Structures are given as C-alpha cells and as structure tokens.
C-alpha cells in the first residue's frame, strides 16, 4: 500500500526514530520491508511471546529466505541474522544482554512499553547503528513516554488514516434467484455454480482485474 511505502522510505532516511502507526496499518509488514533494505543483523524486541509468534509468521511470509532465531524463555537459539527477542528475557536483573551488541539494527515493537526499568536500562546502553521504535501511541499515562525519544529517537513518521485497513468492495448484481421454500446449502451451491449469467460476470471481473495488473 502506498502509505506503507511512504512510511518505509521516510524511516530509512534516519538511523534512529519512531514510526507511529494505528492498529491495522501493517507495522510488522513495514518493519519487514525496512529489514529487507538494511543488510545488517537485526534484533526485534517484542513485549510478549504472542507477538514473537506473529513476528515469526510475518518474517516467514515476507522474508522467507532469512534465517530467524528466537530468544525467549527456554528457547534461546539465535541466528545472528534476524532474531526475535522477548522483552522479559532481557529485562531481569540476571539477564544476559551482551549478545545484543552484535546487532546492527534493533527494532522495538510496541515501544511505548519500554518504561520498565530493566528494559529501559538495557536499551539505553546499547550502541547500535540503527534503532527503530514502533507503536500505535507514543504516550503513557505514567509519563514515562518522555524516555522514548532518548531510547528510540524522535518521531520520524506518523501514519494518519481515517479508517486504517479500510477496503472497498463492489457488489455486482447477478440477478440470481433461489425459489425453493427451504434453504438447503448444497442445493444452493449447485444452483449458484450452474448460473450462466453469474459465471460470465465472474469471468469478466477476473479478466478486467488481470488486464489492470498487466
């Protein structure tokens, strides 16, 4: 999407900074594009294992050739290429965090959550080439959002959409009718598949879409 491309291009201009994007705008997709265009070892810090799983799925979909490791709980197998790190695994007092210095880029997902003292200390002492923070809102009720620019850098780009993720649909009138007094789905499916006018309409829509893409 064009707004995603604009956000990626803007963020690539800076070595550090925050990307503000509402839910549904595809922050992970944009981050994957940034990873693809910066050929440096990258650590993605996420606040939960659930997000770690989502990141794994996104990386597998958009960057299938990239080696992905994970550092969370008992699962500590790093690839040194792109590694997903849970915040809890590096924010405890006894956590080993030296390995983070090997990365050229740190991406902090949901960066507004870095107010935890342990995680803040870890990130504040990192000396990396690129630091990217991503969040839907850079504000915290406890006032600790003032730390975000010190850790991730200033806000570099804000995605502003009236309705994030909006998709417009066109309804085509097929003139199909189903006269049976009882609704029996298998019979309805059969009748739909046999309707010549509807089938021709579908074929025309597909043909026009293919021509638009060519």
Sequence positions of predicted segments:
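N-terminal pre-P-loop "Q-motif" helix
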Residues: 1-15
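Conserved RecA-like ASCE P-loop NTPase motor core of nucleic-acid helicases/translocases
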Residues: 41-48, 213-214
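Walker A/P-loop
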Residues: 13-35
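Conserved helix-turn-beta segment of the N-terminal RecA-like "Helicase ATP-binding" lobe
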Residues: 45, 49-74
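Conserved interdomain hinge at the start of the Helicase C-terminal
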Residues: 34, 180-214
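Conserved helix/coil segment N-terminal to the catalytic DExD/H
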Residues: 72-105, 116-121
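Post-DEXD/H (motif II) to motif III coupling segment of the RecA-like Helicase ATP-binding lobe
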Residues: 104-105, 112-170
């Amino acid at each position: 999407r064009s707004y995603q491309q604009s956000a990626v291009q803007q963020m690539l201009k800076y070595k550090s900074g925050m990307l503000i994007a509402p839910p549904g705008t595809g922050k992970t997709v944009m981050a994957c594009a940034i990873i693809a265009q910066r050929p440096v070892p990258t650590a993605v810090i996420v606040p939960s294992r659930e997000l770690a799983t989502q990141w794994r799925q996104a990386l597998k979909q958009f960057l299938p050739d990239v080696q992905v490791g994970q550092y969370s709980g008992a699962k500590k197998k790093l690839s040194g290429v792109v590694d997903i790190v849970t915040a809890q695994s590096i924010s405890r007092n006894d956590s080993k965090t030296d390995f983070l210095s090997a990365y050229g880029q740190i991406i902090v997902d949901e960066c507004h959550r870095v107010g935890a003292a342990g995680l803040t200390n870890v990130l504040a002492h990192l000396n990396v080439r690129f630091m990217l923070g991503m969040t839907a809102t850079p504000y915290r009720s406890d006032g600790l959002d003032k730390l975000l620019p010190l850790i991730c850098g200033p806000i570099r780009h804000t995605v502003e959409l009236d309705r994030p993720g909006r998709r417009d649909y066109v309804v085509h009138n097929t003139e199909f009718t189903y006269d049976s007094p009882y609704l029996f789905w298998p019979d309805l499916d059969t009748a739909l598949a046999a309707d010549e006018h509807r089938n021709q309409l579908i074929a025309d829509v597909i043909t026009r879409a293919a021509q638009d893409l060519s």
